[in-house]
């Protein structure tokens, strides 16, 4: 499933509403180095998909690198079981809630960043509602009906 940054379609909103967490020098939060950790949202850009998931690429202000990629599904396990009909129990469990994305490279700080998400952001109801709103906005641009008059003509034989 392809994912695209929310920023790519809504740059001004993303600039204003992307969440970051500051870890101070002596705080030792989850053994993370002092930095601001920005949680950049990415959503599925496959037409017709309704996975209700977000991937956070977490970028450190110190390294300017992606330190973790967290997948988060906010719906129930029953929702994901119906959505992914042929998935195993393990597949379904991985779709719901936060986890490090297994197919993305992760830094040595990824586990600590995941705990930071679980302890702070996942429990912030207004933030999770904002992510859901961003998902709906993004999906509306992916799933909007196409004008048949704008279709390209096929050429060749």
Residue ranges and their predicted role:
Residues 1-24:
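Charged, compositionally biased non-catalytic regions
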Residues 2, 38-40, 102:
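Mixed-charge, polar/low-complexity N-terminal
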Residues 4-7, 38, 80, 85:
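Compositionally biased, low-structure terminal segments
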Residues 12, 99, 146-149:
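Generic low-complexity segments that are intrinsically disordered, proline-rich and/or Lys/Arg-biased
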Residues 23-72:
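Amphipathic, interaction-prone secondary-structure segments
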Residues 52-55, 81-87, 145:
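Surface-exposed beta-strand edges and their flanking turn/coil or helix-capping segments
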Residues 62-133:
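An exposed acidic His-Trp-rich patch
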């Amino acid at each position: 499933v392809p994912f695209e940054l929310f920023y790519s379609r809504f740059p001004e909103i993303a600039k204003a509403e992307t969440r970051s967490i500051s870890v101070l020098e002596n705080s030792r939060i989850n053994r993370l180095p002092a930095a601001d950790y920005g949680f950049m949202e990415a959503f599925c850009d496959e037409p017709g998909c309704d996975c209700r998931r977000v991937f956070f690429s977490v970028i450190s202000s110190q390294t300017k690198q992606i330190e973790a990629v967290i997948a988060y599904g906010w719906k129930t396990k029953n929702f994901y079981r119906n959505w992914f009909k042929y998935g195993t129990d393990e597949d379904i469990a991985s779709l719901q809630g936060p986890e490090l994305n297994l197919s993305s490279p992760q830094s040595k700080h990824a586990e600590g960043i995941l705990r930071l998400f679980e302890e702070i952001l996942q429990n912030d109801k207004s933030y999770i509602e904002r992510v859901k709103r961003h998902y709906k906005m993004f999906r509306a641009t992916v799933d909007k009906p196409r004008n048949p008059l704008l279709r390209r003509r096929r050429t060749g034989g």
